[in-house]
Structure formats: structure tokens, C-alpha cells
């Protein structure tokens, strides 16, 4: 990061992702080409190192995101900020935008491949080819919680470790709803999976978002249901819904000049939208920066 006055983008990965995920790194490279800086948030346990508490990240964990945004806003005071979230990170992003105090310099956000209605999306993963994704994600989640159990034991936090062991033993889990009901809900203060879905689905909060925000969805996303493509009347005037006929889940791959070098629609669309929302003062600073030094002092 160089204090150039250019925007800084905070990026939140999806379920089973991390700051090293291809879609995160790809966006960071695209932003760097524009002279923008970026920060990638790693949610609890995302790097493979379990955190010290009997909790993880979920659609309603926007308190963690709020802490990161506050830290970034304080560390880079006055710098224009924007926010991008993918999949579950997109759900966290939208819930954060709707329910939390926002930094004064946050000017725009984007959420991609978002399960806006958690209940129907959980059931969607029990159908057809989507079950392949469900098995992969549930296997990763079980491994993450098992690592957490070992970490808690190593710290002498036996009560927490044993509680999680007891919940995991209720498996095997053959659906997200069963896993969320047995593990996620009780460990994060929800009465049940239904309670978690009802309280943390971003769909109910969209009308409360006032920061300019684009939601990018693909019509062929195997994770999403019709409820994830809301009518314009349910959106606030600050929300924009961009639906692509193809793109899958966080994929959005387009043919490149060579078949081994595909291009990614999101690496073009996200910076394009964020750039369209940049404050005029930042645009002026960027223009001045591109001028020869002799002209910069007179125009800055």
C-alpha cells in the first residue's frame, strides 16, 4: 500500500475459501493494474489454522467484518474504501451494509454469487448435481471443526472442545440443513437451522442498504434459487442487480485469446462498477497523478 489517495478495496472470501483463493487473488491483480490497493480478509479458521474460540464464520458473522472494516478505516484514515464479498462472504457483506455503522469513506460495495435466502439455498444443495458441491463443502467444514477441537484441547479448553466433539458426533451429516441445525446454530446462538436462516438471510435486509452496492448473480448458479434473484421493487435505490445467464458459482469464466488463458468476467465487472462510484475528489487526484510533475502542483 502506498498513500496515493487511490481507493482501497476490502475483499471477503466465500465458504471454504481464503485470501489465497483464485478469485480473490485475481481481483487483487485486476485492482492493482488500476492503481488501487486491496486487503483480503481471512475469516475465522479459513487459513487452516483454527482460532481459539468455539465459533466460526457464517452468514451472520458481520460483527467480524465490522471489526476489520473499522481497523482498516482507522489505519488508512481518509482513504476511500470499498468492499467486495463472495458467496457466504457476500452474505456477510450485505448483512454488514444493512445493519452496522459504516466507515465515513466507504463509497461502494459488490456482492457476488450470494445465497440471499439461506433456507432455500441449503435445500437446493440437496438436489441433482448440486449434491457434489454439498459433499465437498461439508467434508471441508467437518475437517475445519475437527482441527478446532484439537486446537482447543491443546489450549486446555476442554469444555469447549468436548462440546464441539459432542455436536460433531451427531453426524454423519448428509445435508447443510442437518449440519447447520446440529453444529452451526447451537455454537453461534441460534435456536435451530431455521432460526439461523431466518435471522441471517440477506434478502430481508436489502431495502436497508444505502451504500451503492451491486449484486452479481449467475442464472445457472447451482447454489442459488429463484429467491436469490429479487424483483427490483424489493431493492433499495442504492442496489443494482446484475444477472448473467452463465457464470456458475463465483466462476464467470469467459474465453480468452488462448484456451489455456481464460478471462474472468468478475475481474472486469467489479472494478468497472466500483470505478463508476468513485468520489469526484478521488477522480481528480487520479487525473493529477497522471500529469507531468510540472502541472501537478497547479492542479492538485
Predicted regions and their residues:
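Short beta-strand-to-loop junctions in surface cap/lid or active-site-entrance loops
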Residues: 1-5
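Short beta-strand element of the alpha/beta-hydrolase
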Residues: 6-14
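Conserved alpha/beta-hydrolase
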Residues: 17-20, 28-52
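Catalytic nucleophile-loop/oxyanion-hole region of alpha/beta-hydrolase
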Residues: 44-82
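Alpha/beta-hydrolase-fold enzymes
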Residues: 76-187
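Short beta-strand/loop motif that positions the catalytic acidic residue
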Residues: 209, 215-217
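Catalytic histidine neighborhood in serine/cysteine hydrolases
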Residues: 235-252
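Catalytic active-site module of serine/aspartate enzymes centered on a nucleophile-bearing elbow/loop
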Residues: 247, 251-300
Amino acid at each position: 500500500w502506498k498513500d496515493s489517495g487511490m481507493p482501497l478495496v476490502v475483499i471477503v472470501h466465500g465458504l471454504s475459501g481464503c485470501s489465497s483463493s483464485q478469485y480473490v487473488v485475481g481481483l487483487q491483480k485486476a485492482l492493482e493494474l488500476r492503481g488501487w490497493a486491496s486487503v483480503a480478509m481471512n475469516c475465522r479458521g479459513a487459513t487452516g489454522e483454527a482460532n481459539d474460540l468455539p465459533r466460526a464464520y457464517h452468514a451472520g458473522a458481520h460483527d467480524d467484518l465490522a471489526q476489520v472494516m473499522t481497523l482498516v478505516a482507522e489505519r488508512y484514515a481518509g482513504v476511500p474504501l470499498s468492499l467486495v464479498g463472495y458467496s457466504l462472504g457476500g452474505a456477510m457483506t450485505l448483512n454488514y451494509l444493512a445493519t452496522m455503522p459504516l466507515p465515513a469513506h466507504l463509497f461502494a460495495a459488490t456482492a457476488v454469487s450470494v445465497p440471499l435466502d439461506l433456507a432455500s439455498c441449503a435445500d437446493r444443495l440437496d438436489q441433482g448435481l448440486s449434491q457434489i458441491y454439498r459433499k465437498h463443502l461439508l467434508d471441508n467444514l467437518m475437517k475445519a471443526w475437527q482441527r478446532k477441537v484439537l486446537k482447543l484441547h491443546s489450549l486446555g479448553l476442554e469444555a469447549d472442545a468436548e462440546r464441539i466433539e459432542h455436536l460433531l458426533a451427531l453426524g454423519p451429516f448428509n445435508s447443510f440443513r442437518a449440519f447447520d441445525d446440529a453444529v452451526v446454530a447451537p455454537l453461534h446462538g441460534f435456536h435451530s437451522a431455521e432460526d439461523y436462516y431466518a435471522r441471517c438471510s440477506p434478502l430481508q435486509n436489502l431495502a436497508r442498504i444505502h451504500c451503492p452496492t451491486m449484486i452479481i448473480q449467475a442464472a445457472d448458479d447451482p447454489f442459488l434459487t429463484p429467491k436469490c434473484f429479487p424483483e427490483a421493487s424489493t431493492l433499495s435505490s442504492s442496489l443494482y442487480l446484475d444477472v448473467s445467464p452463465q457464470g456458475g458459482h463465483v466462476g464467470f469464466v469467459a474465453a480468452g485469446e488462448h484456451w489455456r488463458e481464460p478471462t474472468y468476467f468478475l475481474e472486469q465487472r467489479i472494478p468497472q462498477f466500483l470505478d463508476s462510484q468513485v468520489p469526484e475528489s478521488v477522480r481528480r487526484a487520479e487525473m493529477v497523478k497522471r500529469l507531468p510533475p510540472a502541472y501537478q502542483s497547479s492542479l492538485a
